[in-house]
Amino acid sequence: MGLAAPRKKIKISHDPNNTNWSRSTSGFGHKILSSQGWTPGSFLGARNAAHAEMFTAASASHIKVVLKDDTLGLGARPKRDPLNEPTGLDAFKGLLGRLNGKSDADLQVEQQKRDNVKLARYAATKWQAVTFISGGLLAQEKTTPIVTEEPQGIHKDKQEDKLSATVPGPDSDGVEGSDNIGGQSDQSIKKKKSKSKNHREKKDRKRKHTEEPESTDSGNTNKRSTEKKSKATRDDEESSSTTSKGLSRERRPMGRHVFRGRHIAQKKAALMDEKSLNEIFMVKS
């Protein structure tokens, strides 16, 4: 408070330590405790408690208040000298050891122990103690092989190759093998024959087109050549598309990409529509 604050007169009582209150026997606390079986000098709580052995003479005395005038936490101790011993005590202990008849080797061992204790105390006060906790040993995790699902077209081709390997050729004399093979092998052979026929027909068509004589009209020849090239490219694209469909999978958008794709598609549709553009730009049609 400053000088402008109201003046307060404080009178020092005759009992500054408040000993009259602690020694009085007419108070409410003393009466209720004595009614519960407490007597002056005894401890509070059950006498047959598990922690009764931990009580000392200080437990029966009055509670003492310590003024906290620092910013340390509760229970923290102020800084003290780590050695906390009078100077020259080590030399005095060594002198007493020599007088008692101890050898120099024993005195050096004791001095080394004292030095180690001093260093440990200094390190504990200077730096926080580090405790290492073992976190176990590093071990290699078991790698589970990833099973990739093959497309149906490749799987069927492999089965057909296996069946064709077991089927004997037309020139071979093995009649028993043809009897053992079921209807599946016959179907696979028919499919292979049809594929080979189609391939041969395509090659024959190409040869015929190349062996035809050149026509007199240059425009007709150019048209025919372009048509041939377009047919060949179409056939190649169809064959490549059939193989690529079997091998590659459709990449479907997942998560937020689905909503983003829809939003972009709606924007494109709105830009392509004249009515929506007029509504956006507030133009009367």
UniProtKB/Swiss-Prot annotation:
The UniProt record lists the keyword Cell membrane: no
Chain intervals for the UniProt region annotation (Disordered): 1-23, 144-263
Keywords: Nucleus, Ribosome biogenesis, rRNA processing
Name recorded for this polypeptide: Protein pxr1
Main location: nucleus
Organism field: Aspergillus niger (strain ATCC MYA-4892 / CBS 513.88 / FGSC A1513)
Signal peptide: none
Gene Ontology annotations for the cellular component aspect, listed alphabetically: nucleolus
Any GO BP annotation: rRNA processing
Biased composition (Basic and acidic residues): 152-163, 224-234
Family matches, as InterPro entries: G_patch_dom (IPR000467), PINX1 (IPR050656)
Ranges for domain G-patch: 25-79
Residue spans of biased composition, Basic residues class: 1-11, 190-208, 254-263
Function: Involved in rRNA-processing at A0, A1 and A2 sites and negatively regulates telomerase.
Subcellular location(s) per record: Nucleus, Nucleolus
Keyword rRNA processing (UniProt): yes
Pfam families from the UniProt entry: G-patch
GO MF term set: nucleic acid binding
Similarity remark: Belongs to the PINX1 family.
